[in-house]
């Protein structure tokens, strides 16, 4: 039986994206997105909860994210969850779960500067949305 691994989030950029290139020359950009959830409790008191998601984009989408995304901007990200594992220099094992983006849409104005942008970009057909 085939599984499903799909994630869709709408939130605000926590920081400017960081781009690098793999030894084989593939662009990879990483950034974090904060989502917020509001609700009213049984006592009629308002509550707010935030979640922070690590996101990585590859290839052409990585370059587009680096060029157009900035801290404070609202963004839609679609992709899949991936957990990476590695061992540090002291032999300790570490894990990181992140969203591997295959689509990004800039939704509105930056909170830090009122400059509306409405851009949609997809990695489909790019062939560069996987790690080396």
Feature roles, as predicted:
Residues 1-4, 20-24, 41-46, 91-92, ...:
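Acidic, gly/ser/pro-rich intrinsically disordered tails
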Residues 8-13, 33, 71-82, 101-104:
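OB-fold and OB-like beta-barrel modules that bind single-stranded nucleic acids
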Residues 9-49, 85, 95:
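Core FKBP-type peptidyl-prolyl cis-trans isomerase
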Residues 10, 14-16, 52-54, 58, ...:
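Conserved beta-strand residues within beta-sheet cores
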Residues 14, 20, 58, 82, ...:
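Conserved positions in beta-strands of structured domains
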Residues 41-67:
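A beta-strand/beta-hairpin structural motif
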Residues 58-94:
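Beta-rich strand-turn-strand
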Residues 88-106:
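OB-fold/S1-family single-stranded nucleic acid-binding modules
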């Amino acid at each position: 039986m085939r599984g499903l691994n799909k994630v869709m989030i709408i939130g605000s950029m926590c920081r400017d994206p960081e781009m690098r290139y793999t030894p084989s020359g593939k662009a990879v950009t990483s950034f974090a997105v904060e989502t917020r959830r509001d609700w009213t409790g049984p006592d009629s008191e308002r509550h707010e909860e935030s979640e922070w998601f690590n996101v990585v984009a590859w290839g052409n989408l990585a370059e587009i994210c680096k060029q157009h995304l900035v801290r404070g901007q609202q963004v839609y990200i679609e992709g899949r969850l991936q957990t990476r594992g590695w061992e540090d220099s002291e032999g300790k094992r570490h894990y990181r779960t992140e969203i591997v983006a295959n689509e990004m849409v800039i939704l509105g104005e930056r909170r830090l500067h009122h400059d509306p942008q409405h851009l949609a970009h997809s990695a489909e057909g790019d062939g560069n949305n996987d790690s080396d």
